[in-house]
C-alpha cells in the first residue's frame, strides 16, 4: 500500500513564525562567531569603562584598542558568515522548492488515489444494487413458478 500524506506531518517551523528568543537562538546557531565577538567587544568596553572610572589611562587605552580589534573581527565574521550562509540559504531555498514540488506531486497522487477508491466504491454500490434488483426479479419469478406449481398440483390432484 502506498504511503498517503497525513495532515499530521509537521515540517520545520518557518523563521518568521519563531518567537523573539527562538529567533536569537536560531541566528546564533547559524553564525556562532558573531555573538561571541559581540560578547567579547562588550566585555572590552566594560573593562575600558571601569579603568576610565578608576583613572588608569593605559589600561583604558588598551581595552579600547581591543574593542576596536574585536569589533573589526566581529564585523569580518558577520560578513564571512553572511557570504557562507547566503550560499547555504540559496541551496536551502532550492531544496525547499524541490520539496514543495514533491509535496504537490504527492498530493496530486493522493487525490487520484482517493478518486480511484471513490470510483471503486461507486462501482461496488452499482453492482450491489444490480444484484439486489436481480434478486428481487428472481424472487418474483420464483414466486410465480411456485404459484404455477401449486396450480398444477391442484389440477393434478383433482
UniProtKB/Swiss-Prot annotation:
One of its GO terms (cellular component) is mitochondrial inner membrane. It is found in: Mitochondrion membrane. Pfam families: HIG_1_N. It is a multi-pass membrane protein. Its main location: mitochondrion. Residues 99-158 form a coiled coil. One of its GO terms (biological process) is mitochondrial cytochrome c oxidase assembly. The chain crosses the membrane at residues 32-54, 64-86. The keyword Transmembrane helix applies. Belongs to the RCF1 family. Cytochrome c oxidase subunit which plays a role in assembly of respiratory supercomplexes. Associates with the respiratory chain complex III/complex IV supercomplex. This is Respiratory supercomplex factor 1, mitochondrial. It comes from Candida glabrata (strain ATCC 2001 / BCRC 20586 / JCM 3761 / NBRC 0622 / NRRL Y-65 / CBS 138) (Yeast). The gene is RCF1.
Amino acid at each position: 500500500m502506498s504511503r498517503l500524506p497525513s495532515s499530521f506531518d509537521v515540517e520545520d517551523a518557518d523563521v518568521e513564525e519563531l518567537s523573539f528568543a527562538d529567533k536569537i537562538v536560531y541566528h546564533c546557531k547559524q553564525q556562532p562567531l558573531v555573538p561571541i565577538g559581540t560578547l567579547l567587544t562588550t566585555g572590552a568596553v566594560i573593562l575600558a569603562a571601569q579603568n576610565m572610572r578608576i583613572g588608569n589611562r593605559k589600561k583604558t587605552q588598551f581595552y579600547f584598542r581591543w574593542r576596536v580589534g574585536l569589533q573589526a573581527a566581529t564585523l569580518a565574521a558577520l560578513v564571512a558568515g553572511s557570504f557562507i550562509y547566503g550560499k547555504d540559504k540559496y541551496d536551502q531555498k532550492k531544496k525547499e522548492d524541490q520539496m514543495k514540488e514533491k509535496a504537490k506531486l504527492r498530493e496530486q497522487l493522493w487525490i487520484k488515489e482517493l478518486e480511484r477508491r471513490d470510483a471503486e466504491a461507486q462501482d461496488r454500490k452499482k453492482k450491489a444494487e444490480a444484484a439486489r434488483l436481480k434478486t428481487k426479479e428472481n424472487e418474483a419469478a420464483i414466486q410465480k413458478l411456485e404459484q404455477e406449481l401449486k396450480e398444477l398440483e391442484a389440477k393434478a390432484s383433482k
